């Protein structure tokens, strides 16, 4: 599951159409590392947002029915949030309300395949023993998707704030 849900979006981002706004950016200094403090802080903030949503999901599930449901919510949220995060990785600029959000058919396909696999793991009876999760009903699955999706607009908003 992890190989498909991480690898396919990464490959799809490799064929992302170029950003028409990129030439408006100042070039980085020739000796400047790609891994700048600013870039690493963006990674840390994105991770903090996704981690926070995963913890909220865990606590929600834990309060509903204990540790197994909590860990199932956390697993589903983290896997799906990483798929949603692929859209955050398209650009340094916010893309959520632009046509660029949907311009990479490979990323959309990778997202749909990954989401279908994760949904199957969380809802198909019999798979709970293989993946050590609790089978979710529709309302529970909705909670997982909501927690995972929430990271997307939050990170997009942070990108908008950084650019302003």
Name each region found by the language model.
Residues 1-164:
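C-terminal transmembrane helices and immediately adjacent loops/tails
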